[in-house]
Amino acid sequence: DKENAGLLDPFVIMKNIEDGATLAKEILTFLTGISTRDGEKFPVLIRAIGKVKDSEHRGLLNVIAELRKEETVIANNIADHIESFVDYDFAQLLFSDGSVENAISLDNQLNIIQVADLVLPDKDTSFEEYTTIELLSVAMLIVISTFALDFIHSDRSIFKIVDLDEAWAFLNVAQG
């Protein structure tokens, strides 16, 4: 659904800019498989995320744009890799250019996050065996879980409930 595009972008869903950048790092390293131990790719990705964090328009699509600006083989390969996920209709929730207005907010009394068609891997499936849809589903699970924790820890003077419908699906995944 085009009207929901980018709602789960880490830069959009997190209230704190630093938290958004941290979650963006987690999501993009998860999706691309770039390890913190990769001395070539990891610094390039982190630098691009940092530039987006410091910009006016924050969104994962802008990380791709920042990588392209570097005009290096490594940066272009990382940009291509991230962009390959954007082509999935399902992934539209995760990627924005930072112009999303209908954002999910910690200040709302009620947030309903319903993601249809999540395909979560079996608990026994190794990370290397995840399909692309499973990777994207787990990435969304990570974003939703991080938002839920942020919601729980915000303004503790207000009573809150987080209801995870069909939580068994979340709990059957290693990341859940």
Where are these regions (language model features)?
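P-loop NTPase motor domains
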Residues: D1-G176
